[in-house]
Amino acid sequence: MPLYSGDKISIGKFVIGNPMPIVVTSVFYEDVSTFVERLQTKVLSDKNLYEIRFDMFTEREISDEEELISAMREMDIDYIFTYRGKDARKYYETAIRKMAPAVDIDMDLIGKLEAKPTVTKVIGSYHTSDSEAMMSALDRMIDSDVDMVKVACSYSEDQEFLGDLKRIIDIRKNRRKPIAYVPMGRTFWRALAGYYVSDIVYAMADRPTAYGQPPADYYYQAFKALFY
Protein backbone atom coordinates (compact mmCIF):
# COMPACT_ATOMS: atom_id res chain seq x y z
CA MET A 1 0.00 0.00 0.00
CA PRO A 2 1.15 3.64 -0.17
CA LEU A 3 3.54 4.66 2.60
CA TYR A 4 0.60 6.48 4.18
CA SER A 5 -2.64 4.66 3.39
CA GLY A 6 -6.28 4.72 4.40
CA ASP A 7 -8.67 2.09 5.64
CA LYS A 8 -9.63 -0.67 3.22
CA ILE A 9 -12.82 -0.45 1.17
CA SER A 10 -14.07 -2.63 -1.66
CA ILE A 11 -15.23 -1.58 -5.11
CA GLY A 12 -16.70 -4.79 -6.42
CA LYS A 13 -13.95 -7.40 -6.28
CA PHE A 14 -11.19 -4.80 -5.84
CA VAL A 15 -9.93 -4.05 -2.35
CA ILE A 16 -8.59 -0.53 -2.05
CA GLY A 17 -5.64 -0.53 0.37
CA ASN A 18 -3.76 -3.59 -0.89
CA PRO A 19 0.08 -3.72 -1.16
CA MET A 20 0.20 -1.25 -4.07
CA PRO A 21 -2.26 1.41 -5.26
CA ILE A 22 -4.95 0.03 -7.55
CA VAL A 23 -4.46 1.20 -11.14
CA VAL A 24 -7.83 2.37 -12.48
CA THR A 25 -8.13 2.45 -16.28
CA SER A 26 -10.10 5.52 -17.38
CA VAL A 27 -12.08 5.10 -20.61
CA PHE A 28 -14.58 6.71 -22.95
CA TYR A 29 -15.95 5.72 -26.34
CA GLU A 30 -18.49 6.92 -28.87
CA ASP A 31 -21.15 4.57 -27.58
CA VAL A 32 -21.78 1.73 -25.17
CA SER A 33 -21.69 -0.98 -27.85
CA THR A 34 -18.14 0.01 -28.88
CA PHE A 35 -16.94 -0.21 -25.29
CA VAL A 36 -18.68 -3.54 -24.68
CA GLU A 37 -17.28 -4.99 -27.91
CA ARG A 38 -13.73 -4.08 -26.85
CA LEU A 39 -14.28 -5.90 -23.58
CA GLN A 40 -15.87 -8.94 -25.20
CA THR A 41 -13.07 -9.26 -27.77
CA LYS A 42 -10.39 -8.79 -25.06
CA VAL A 43 -9.02 -5.62 -26.63
CA LEU A 44 -9.66 -4.32 -23.13
CA SER A 45 -9.00 -6.65 -20.22
CA ASP A 46 -11.95 -7.84 -18.17
CA LYS A 47 -9.61 -7.96 -15.14
CA ASN A 48 -9.23 -4.19 -14.79
CA LEU A 49 -11.03 -1.77 -12.53
CA TYR A 50 -12.35 0.89 -14.91
CA GLU A 51 -13.36 4.49 -14.56
CA ILE A 52 -16.10 5.06 -17.13
CA ARG A 53 -16.15 8.74 -18.14
CA PHE A 54 -19.71 8.62 -19.38
CA ASP A 55 -19.84 12.39 -19.89
CA MET A 56 -17.25 11.94 -22.66
CA PHE A 57 -19.33 9.37 -24.58
CA THR A 58 -21.03 10.74 -27.70
CA GLU A 59 -24.20 8.74 -27.06
CA ARG A 60 -25.05 9.22 -23.40
CA GLU A 61 -28.77 9.15 -22.79
CA ILE A 62 -30.10 7.59 -19.59
CA SER A 63 -31.13 4.57 -21.65
CA ASP A 64 -27.50 4.23 -22.78
CA GLU A 65 -26.36 4.39 -19.17
CA GLU A 66 -28.81 1.66 -18.20
CA GLU A 67 -27.56 -0.48 -21.09
CA LEU A 68 -23.99 0.07 -19.91
CA ILE A 69 -24.71 -0.90 -16.30
CA SER A 70 -26.55 -4.05 -17.38
CA ALA A 71 -23.73 -5.09 -19.73
CA MET A 72 -21.05 -4.56 -17.09
CA ARG A 73 -23.02 -6.60 -14.58
CA GLU A 74 -23.44 -9.46 -17.07
CA MET A 75 -19.69 -9.47 -17.75
CA ASP A 76 -18.90 -9.15 -14.02
CA ILE A 77 -16.62 -6.15 -14.60
CA ASP A 78 -16.12 -3.57 -11.85
CA TYR A 79 -15.98 0.15 -12.48
CA ILE A 80 -16.33 3.67 -11.17
CA PHE A 81 -19.07 5.61 -12.95
CA THR A 82 -18.16 9.27 -13.57
CA TYR A 83 -20.21 12.04 -15.16
CA ARG A 84 -19.06 15.66 -15.23
CA GLY A 85 -21.25 18.50 -16.42
CA LYS A 86 -24.89 19.34 -17.00
CA ASP A 87 -27.55 17.04 -15.55
CA ALA A 88 -24.96 15.01 -13.63
CA ARG A 89 -27.41 14.40 -10.80
CA LYS A 90 -29.83 12.31 -12.88
CA TYR A 91 -26.98 10.12 -14.16
CA TYR A 92 -25.70 9.51 -10.64
CA GLU A 93 -29.21 8.82 -9.34
CA THR A 94 -29.58 6.17 -12.05
CA ALA A 95 -26.16 4.64 -11.32
CA ILE A 96 -26.94 4.35 -7.61
CA ARG A 97 -30.43 2.92 -8.16
CA LYS A 98 -28.97 0.37 -10.60
CA MET A 99 -26.28 -0.49 -8.01
CA ALA A 100 -23.16 0.47 -9.96
CA PRO A 101 -20.05 -0.60 -7.97
CA ALA A 102 -18.92 3.02 -7.43
CA VAL A 103 -19.65 6.58 -8.48
CA ASP A 104 -17.31 9.58 -8.55
CA ILE A 105 -19.35 12.69 -7.72
CA ASP A 106 -18.35 16.34 -7.58
CA MET A 107 -18.06 17.77 -4.08
CA ASP A 108 -21.05 20.07 -4.70
CA LEU A 109 -23.33 17.03 -5.05
CA ILE A 110 -22.34 15.39 -1.76
CA GLY A 111 -25.45 14.94 0.36
CA LYS A 112 -27.77 16.20 -2.41
CA LEU A 113 -28.67 12.98 -4.21
CA GLU A 114 -32.08 11.48 -3.49
CA ALA A 115 -30.96 7.92 -4.19
CA LYS A 116 -29.21 6.48 -1.15
CA PRO A 117 -26.41 4.01 -1.89
CA THR A 118 -26.67 0.55 -0.36
CA VAL A 119 -24.12 -1.20 -2.56
CA THR A 120 -22.53 1.66 -4.48
CA LYS A 121 -19.37 3.22 -3.02
CA VAL A 122 -19.30 7.02 -3.27
CA ILE A 123 -16.10 8.87 -4.14
CA GLY A 124 -16.28 12.60 -3.54
CA SER A 125 -14.04 14.58 -5.88
CA TYR A 126 -12.77 18.10 -6.44
CA HIS A 127 -10.71 19.45 -9.35
CA THR A 128 -8.92 22.79 -9.38
CA SER A 129 -5.76 24.73 -10.17
CA ASP A 130 -5.86 26.43 -6.76
CA SER A 131 -3.79 24.61 -4.16
CA GLU A 132 -5.46 26.20 -1.14
CA ALA A 133 -8.94 25.47 -2.49
CA MET A 134 -7.91 21.85 -2.97
CA MET A 135 -6.71 21.48 0.61
CA SER A 136 -9.90 23.05 1.94
CA ALA A 137 -12.00 20.70 -0.20
CA LEU A 138 -9.98 17.73 1.01
CA ASP A 139 -10.74 18.58 4.64
CA ARG A 140 -14.45 19.04 3.93
CA MET A 141 -14.80 15.77 2.04
CA ILE A 142 -12.85 13.74 4.59
CA ASP A 143 -15.37 14.95 7.18
CA SER A 144 -18.34 14.04 4.94
CA ASP A 145 -20.01 10.63 4.64
CA VAL A 146 -18.45 9.63 1.31
CA ASP A 147 -16.48 6.38 1.21
CA MET A 148 -13.39 7.83 -0.49
CA VAL A 149 -12.01 11.22 -1.47
CA LYS A 150 -10.33 12.33 -4.70
CA VAL A 151 -8.62 15.70 -5.17
CA ALA A 152 -6.92 16.83 -8.37
CA CYS A 153 -4.85 19.97 -8.86
CA SER A 154 -2.96 21.38 -11.85
CA TYR A 155 0.65 22.39 -11.20
CA SER A 156 3.39 24.06 -13.20
CA GLU A 157 6.23 23.86 -10.68
CA ASP A 158 7.81 20.98 -8.75
CA GLN A 159 7.81 22.92 -5.48
CA GLU A 160 4.06 23.54 -5.63
CA PHE A 161 3.37 19.84 -6.01
CA LEU A 162 5.91 18.76 -3.39
CA GLY A 163 4.51 21.25 -0.89
CA ASP A 164 0.99 19.88 -1.29
CA LEU A 165 2.24 16.29 -1.21
CA LYS A 166 3.84 16.97 2.18
CA ARG A 167 0.63 18.51 3.51
CA ILE A 168 -1.44 15.54 2.34
CA ILE A 169 1.07 13.14 3.93
CA ASP A 170 0.55 14.99 7.23
CA ILE A 171 -3.22 14.61 6.86
CA ARG A 172 -2.92 10.90 6.08
CA LYS A 173 -1.01 10.24 9.28
CA ASN A 174 -4.11 10.99 11.35
CA ARG A 175 -7.13 10.51 9.08
CA ARG A 176 -7.98 7.13 7.61
CA LYS A 177 -10.45 7.77 4.81
CA PRO A 178 -9.06 6.44 1.48
CA ILE A 179 -7.67 9.15 -0.80
CA ALA A 180 -6.78 9.59 -4.45
CA TYR A 181 -4.48 12.58 -4.94
CA VAL A 182 -4.08 13.43 -8.63
CA PRO A 183 -1.37 16.01 -9.43
CA MET A 184 -1.90 17.12 -13.01
CA GLY A 185 1.11 18.41 -14.88
CA ARG A 186 3.85 15.81 -15.05
CA THR A 187 3.24 12.11 -15.34
CA PHE A 188 5.80 11.13 -12.71
CA TRP A 189 4.04 13.27 -10.12
CA ARG A 190 1.06 10.92 -10.42
CA ALA A 191 3.25 7.89 -9.68
CA LEU A 192 4.93 9.69 -6.78
CA ALA A 193 1.54 10.58 -5.28
CA GLY A 194 0.59 6.91 -5.62
CA TYR A 195 3.76 5.85 -3.84
CA TYR A 196 3.17 8.16 -0.89
CA VAL A 197 -0.57 8.70 -0.39
CA SER A 198 -2.92 7.62 -3.20
CA ASP A 199 -4.92 4.44 -2.74
CA ILE A 200 -5.81 4.46 -6.45
CA VAL A 201 -4.17 6.01 -9.52
CA TYR A 202 -5.68 6.69 -12.93
CA ALA A 203 -4.32 5.35 -16.24
CA MET A 204 -5.36 5.87 -19.84
CA ALA A 205 -6.57 3.14 -22.21
CA ASP A 206 -6.65 4.28 -25.88
CA ARG A 207 -6.40 7.97 -25.01
CA PRO A 208 -6.15 10.04 -21.85
CA THR A 209 -9.19 11.44 -20.07
CA ALA A 210 -7.09 13.98 -18.14
CA TYR A 211 -3.84 15.91 -18.56
CA GLY A 212 -0.67 13.89 -17.91
CA GLN A 213 -2.47 10.55 -17.58
CA PRO A 214 -0.09 7.67 -18.47
CA PRO A 215 -0.83 4.10 -19.57
CA ALA A 216 -1.08 1.47 -16.85
CA ASP A 217 2.35 0.01 -17.62
CA TYR A 218 3.95 3.31 -16.64
CA TYR A 219 2.64 2.92 -13.10
CA TYR A 220 3.63 -0.73 -12.86
CA GLN A 221 7.20 0.08 -13.87
CA ALA A 222 7.36 3.10 -11.55
CA PHE A 223 5.97 1.16 -8.59
CA LYS A 224 8.32 -1.73 -9.27
CA ALA A 225 11.23 0.70 -8.98
CA LEU A 226 9.83 2.57 -5.97
CA PHE A 227 8.43 -0.27 -3.86
CA TYR A 228 11.15 -2.88 -4.32
UniProtKB/Swiss-Prot annotation:
Keywords: Amino-acid biosynthesis, Aromatic amino acid biosynthesis, Lyase, Schiff base. It catalyses: 3-dehydroquinate = 3-dehydroshikimate + H2O. InterPro entries: Aldolase_TIM, DHquinase_I, Type-I_3-dehydroquinase. GO terms for molecular function: 3-dehydroquinate dehydratase activity. One of its GO terms (biological process) is 3,4-dihydroxybenzoate biosynthetic process. It comes from the Archaea. HAMAP family: AroD. Belongs to the type-I 3-dehydroquinase family. NCBIfam families: PRK01261.1 (NF002321). Homodimer. This is 3-dehydroquinate dehydratase. It comes from Thermoplasma acidophilum (strain ATCC 25905 / DSM 1728 / JCM 9062 / NBRC 15155 / AMRC-C165).
